[in-house]
C-alpha cells in the first residue's frame, strides 16, 4: 500500500515536525490539548482556517514555527500531546475495552461504510445528523480500541453554508474542498 500525503515539510523545524502527524490523524478532533496546541501557534489563523490543522500548517509563517520550536513552555505542551498521541497509536489491544470484554475480536478489523462521516467542522464531508452520528461511532470505536476503518466518499463540495442577504433571503454557499488542504490521505493499493 502506498500512501500519498502532501505534508508541510518546507521549513518545518525538526523539533516540532510531529505537528504533521497530528494534523493528518483526526485524533485531534477529540483531543482538546492537540487542538489547543495548533491554536496557540497562531490563534487568529486557527480561526481563519476554521480549525483545520492541515490548512493551518500550509499557511502559518516560518517565523512562528521557529519561535515555537525554541519556546520551552510550548515544547512541554507539544511533548505531552505527542506522547498521548503515541500512546494511543501504540496502545496494547489487551488494555482496551475490546481486549478486556471481547478478546476474540482483537486483531479483526471492522469496515464501517457510511455515506458521510461528520468528524469535525474542519472536514465538512457531511450534511447532517447521520453523518455526525457516524463520526461519533468512529471516535468511540477508537477510544474502545476497536480497529475500525471508515469507508466513504469524499465529496468535492462538502456541507453547504448558508448566508442571509440584505433582503432576508437565505442562500446556500457551497464549500469547495481541496483534498490537499484537508486532513485526508490518498491511499493506493499495491496492485
Regions found by a protein language model. Name each.
Residues 1-191:
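Catalytic cores of carbohydrate-active enzymes across secretory and cytosolic contexts
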Amino acid at each position: 500500500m502506498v500512501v500519498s500525503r502532501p505534508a508541510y515539510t518546507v521549513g518545518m523545524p525538526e523539533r516540532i515536525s510531529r505537528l504533521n502527524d497530528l494534523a493528518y490523524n483526526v485524533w485531534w478532533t477529540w483531543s482538546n490539548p492537540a487542538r489547543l496546541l495548533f491554536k496557540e501557534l497562531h490563534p487568529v489563523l486557527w480561526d481563519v482556517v476554521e480549525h483545520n490543522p492541515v490548512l493551518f500548517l500550509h499557511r502559518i509563517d516560518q517565523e512562528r514555527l521557529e519561535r515555537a520550536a525554541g519556546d520551552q513552555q510550548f515544547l512541554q505542551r507539544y511533548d505531552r500531546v505527542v506522547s498521548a498521541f503515541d500512546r494511543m497509536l501504540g496502545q496494547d489491544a489487551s488494555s482496551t475495552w475490546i481486549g478486556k470484554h471481547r478478546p476474540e475480536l482483537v486483531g479483526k478489523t471492522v469496515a464501517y461504510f457510511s455515506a458521510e462521516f461528520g468528524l469535525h467542522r474542519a472536514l465538512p464531508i457531511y450534511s447532517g445528523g447521520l453523518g455526525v452520528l457516524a463520526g461519533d461511532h468512529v471516535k468511540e470505536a477508537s477510544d474502545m480500541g476497536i480497529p475500525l476503518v471508515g469507508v466513504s466518499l469524499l465529496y468535492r463540495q462538502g456541507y453547504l453554508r448558508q448566508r442571509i442577504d440584505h433582503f432576508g433571503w437565505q442562500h446556500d454557499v457551497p464549500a469547495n474542498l481541496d483534498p490537499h488542504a484537508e486532513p485526508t490521505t490518498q491511499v493506493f493499493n499495491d496492485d
